[in-house]
């Protein structure tokens, strides 16, 4: 029941924490995998392939968005105490959403990655490296 007892003892809170952990860990694992692949290719051939660069962009944006979603999940189920300025969740929510405002994590980056996945040239030269 909401509003009674310690949050960590509440099934709804436990479920949201598990969901948040899954979001972050899966996104982080994929990001580490594609970074390793691109790094290995760069060491071997001097450059990462277009497909590897598309994966790098997509994994980086996905990791950022997943982190924001995870914090939002926990913030939402934490209740009213998360709203106070002294709350660590309040700070985490502000920080993670500040990161999502960076051009590298903007939703438009999905368009760039999609172009590259489809074999089209990216519109932003920074993706070319």
Can you name each region flagged by the protein language model?
Residues 1-40:
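Extended amphipathic alpha-helical segments enriched in small hydrophobics
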Residues 17-20, 49, 56, 86-89:
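Hydrophobic packing residues in well-ordered alpha-helices of helical domains and bundles
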Residues 18-25, 57, 61-68, 94-97, ...:
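Generic structural signal for well-ordered, non-transmembrane alpha-helical segments
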Residues 26-59, 72-83:
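C-terminal helix-coil-helix/basic helical segment that borders enzyme active sites and/or dimer interfaces
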Residues 33-36, 40, 58, 65, ...:
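Charged/polar, solvent-exposed surface patches and flexible loops
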Residues 80-129:
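Glycine-rich phosphate/cofactor-binding loops in nucleotide/flavin-utilizing enzymes
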């Amino acid at each position: 029941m909401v509003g009674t007892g310690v949050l960590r003892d509440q099934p709804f809170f436990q479920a949201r924490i598990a969901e948040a952990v899954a979001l972050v860990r899966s996104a982080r694992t994929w990001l580490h995998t594609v970074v390793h692949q691109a790094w290995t290719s760069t060491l071997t051939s001097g450059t990462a392939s277009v497909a590897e660069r598309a994966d790098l962009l997509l994994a980086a944006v996905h990791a950022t968005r997943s982190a924001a979603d995870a914090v939002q999940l926990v913030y939402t189920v934490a209740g009213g105490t998360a709203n106070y300025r002294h709350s660590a969740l309040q700070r985490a929510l502000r920080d993670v959403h500040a990161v999502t405002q960076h051009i590298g994590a903007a939703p438009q980056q999905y368009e760039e990655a999609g172009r590259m996945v489809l074999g089209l040239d990216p519109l932003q030269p920074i993706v070319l490296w």
